[in-house]
């Protein structure tokens, strides 16, 4: 701990054994930052994959890690107070729209109580900037595309989305009351190497290779704003010093900056409409194997389509996603074949 003052800004990242958290931590470590990771390493999906991600991070001398639940305030408190970070990037959450229908209590504990604990500690140590992962699922039943940050988000259709919307409201109230600078990031369908096995593209790849059926909901008549992980992480990296300040006059069109708090919501996506069947077709081409398709009705909790407007993030940071989904799929499959050989 004695040498920390000689290093760059300290970054505390929750969810470092998870998909986005792992890549985010790796980005900051590669840039010379000191990173403290925190994760429960739960068994929602393959623990071996989570540990493999962590093993890579642990090779960095500037990486420290504590295993713990977000709900365990004592462990979280000890980690943050000891490290005293200037930036907190809160990416840990119970993910998955469909699982939230089966186990809503897990989402209440991790996403709401856990996020409350992080925000409370951020207030306590007077952080420079708290960045919290939200989700495009908060747009719910909205039918006006692309989604803008200033759009109303009153009709979530999954409990997962409801917990994410709740964290946004909770964060805004804390930011208003205690002047904690907070940015909420609404992620749009993130994919890529080291991804989550519960996500459709991961399941599709596994089943196509094993000659098993893939379930295609709503007969494939839907689209997503698939966003490659490197573009997501680049956006997060560029954002850390862009601290919201409501005392300044708004500089941007359609700015989501709060009138009463140093609080802003930002979309982070690829801004491209990718139809599900086109995505599957690309998987088939790269794998050189046809999928056995099973068409099913729309599933509970799923939204029909998503599409981001990221003009605000672009104006603030210069964010410019560069990865075409065809290239991103190739990179994912190359990793998948290597990891599961």
Descriptions of predicted regions:
Residues 2-4, 27-30, 68, 206-341:
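C-terminal substrate-binding subdomain of Rossmann-fold SDR/epimerase-dehydratase oxidoreductases
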Residues 47, 51-54, 168, 202, ...:
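Short, surface-exposed alpha-helical segments at coil->helix boundaries
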Residues 75, 106, 113, 152, ...:
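Residue-level recognition of oxygen-bearing side chains
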Residues 131, 138-144, 179, 195, ...:
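Proline-centered turn/helix-capping motifs that create local helix->coil transitions or kinks
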Residues 145-146, 197-205:
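A glycine/serine/threonine-rich, flexible loop-to-helix segment
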Residues 166, 170, 174, 204, ...:
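Hydrophobic alpha-helix immediately C-terminal to the catalytic Tyr-X-X-X-Lys motif of short-chain
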């Amino acid at each position: 701990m004695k040498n920390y003052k000689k290093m760059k800004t300290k970054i505390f990242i929750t969810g470092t054994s998870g998909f986005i958290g792992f890549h985010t931590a790796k980005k900051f470590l590669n840039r010379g930052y000191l990173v403290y990771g925190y994760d429960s390493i739960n068994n929602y999906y393959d623990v071996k994959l989570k540990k493999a991600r962590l093993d890579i991070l642990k090779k960095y001398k500037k990486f420290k890690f504590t295993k713990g639940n977000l709900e365990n305030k004592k462990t979280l408190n000890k980690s943050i107070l000891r490290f005293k970070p200037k930036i907190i990037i809160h990416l840990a959450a119970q993910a998955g729209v469909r699982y939230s229908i089966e186990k809503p209590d897990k989402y209440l504990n991790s996403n709401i109580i856990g996020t409350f604990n992080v925000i409370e500690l951020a207030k306590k140590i007077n952080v420079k900037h708290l960045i919290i992962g939200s989700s495009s699922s908060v747009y719910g039943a909205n039918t006006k595309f692309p989604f803008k940050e200033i759009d109303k988000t009153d009709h979530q259709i999954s409990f997962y989305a409801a917990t994410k919307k709740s964290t946004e409201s909770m964060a805004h109230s804390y930011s208003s009351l205690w002047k904690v600078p907070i940015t909420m990031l609404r992620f749009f369908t993130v994919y890529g190497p080291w991804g989550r096995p519960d996500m459709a593209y991961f399941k599709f790849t596994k089943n196509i290779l094993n000659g098993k059926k893939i379930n295609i909901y709503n007969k494939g008549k839907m689209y997503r704003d698939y966003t490659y992980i490197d573009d997501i992480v680049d956006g997060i990296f560029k954002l850390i010093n862009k601290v919201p300040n409501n005392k300044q006059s708004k500089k941007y069109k359609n700015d989501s900056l709060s009138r009463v708090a140093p609080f802003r919501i930002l979309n982070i996506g690829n801004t491209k409409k990718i139809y599900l069947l086109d995505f599957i077709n690309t998987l088939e081409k790269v794998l050189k194997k046809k999928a056995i398709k099973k068409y099913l009705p729309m599933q509970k909790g799923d939204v029909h389509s998503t599409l981001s407007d990221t003009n605000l993030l672009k104006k603030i940071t210069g964010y410019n996603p560069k990865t075409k989904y065809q290239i991103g799929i190739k990179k994912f499959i190359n990793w998948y074949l290597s990891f599961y050989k």
